[in-house]
């Protein structure tokens, strides 16, 4: 064969890319495309090379073009689509990745496309659909990836023992894979088998997945509320893997919660100084500083990031919202234009574009962006939350159908569980148990709490009889709330009505008088959200300004004319249920009293018996 033979040139370029010689691969495929510019294998390989070079936009364009060109066998077309799906998922485009993985499976039954689709669905908090996708795999074709994903999907739907059983039935060949042991450690921890979980994870510390093992061991210690040992694992992690973004972020977050409000982000700053090109570390720093209330420092970090990466959509979009919130409309518009030019198909960018438009009073643009978001992700809570704001700002009464608290929210005063004389007596005992868990000094850097503490509760592994009684107590009111939903396939809350539900998250929040509050927020990964009041200070019971009450409808952005639409007065034993896309907040309240609550998110289950 001549060296000008396209097949030989393609093989040479493939070989160079596999060997990590991206420069040679790029030059080879460029010569090949001069000879055959519309040959699908060459176009697709050029996309893979562009991905290796870090040019994700060009990589996507080339991969999509290779799918559009004629003459590709169905099995090869499936592989091309699978590669594009992996690119989109890794770049943060889950909705687009889902569509492309499904395109791959329409072309041919490709196990890696099926596992890629399942992983994407799990990341979008759609475990029931992920289970359906995984169960369609022919036995033995998915390998350890399918086994681990199936276990994770079962765990997310509340089938904890079934998730464990999947792993115990794994083949002998799977036992040599670290992904198996990481999954096993997580499943054992969720079942409360902490000693066995640690035994599964510790051997991984000497292998190539030591960073993942340290994160898993940290999660295990946090599950046990052993904060100091969790801190030890994270500090060891950043010592060995200083450029690992998740380890650095987790360490900063835990140090903040343990009371280090001054130096918690120093580790990230040091790594950015050493490696200015680390975009992910810069983004993590911006997020941490913003959630710590250090807005000016966060803005400075974002501007430095944009200077390092001119035109970067993420830094630009964040800065656009920051400028909009601080009455700098011209800068906000310039930043969001940059972000939209770079990533018009990214949900995060469209969300910030909607916010900037709302603050600026550009209501038609806000309606356009929010329509795009809800069309793209019909179950996306952020899109619907912003949509309701846009409709309200436009004076469109359709917002009431979606988010009027009188239609979609409910509060109920619960009866005590069996064995308790009154709801007050039950909550006094429950409050004592919860207080014992609130041993941190500050709020997490990823939630809405400010000047308070928030501690996770894990229904699946919870052994405290009072908390088990709480979960039993809320089962009926949740079921009644779901049963009361009318059939409406177009409604973001009602369309997901199912005969069963699962608790997808649960936590307790402690606020003290003076400064403790919740900033207005939604729950992006929920369906039904909640607040249950365990202890309520006298100062807020009849407060004239409703300080300390749960408010609905007021956004966290300065949008003209949009104030709270309703309030729930806290009372011991009262449960509030509402859509996860409903904006809600708690203002600070006077005095020194304690406001202690439990909150949870519920997600629908397509089939099964449901419950916590």
Can you name each region flagged by the protein language model?
Residues 401-495:
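Non-heme Fe(II)/2-oxoglutarate
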Residues 37, 71, 75, 108-109, ...:
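Short coil turns that delineate tetratricopeptide repeat
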Residues 7, 41, 75-79, 112, ...:
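Start-of-helix register in tetratricopeptide repeats
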Residues 461-475, 479-577, 582-612:
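Catalytic core of non-heme Fe(II) oxygenases with the double-stranded beta-helix
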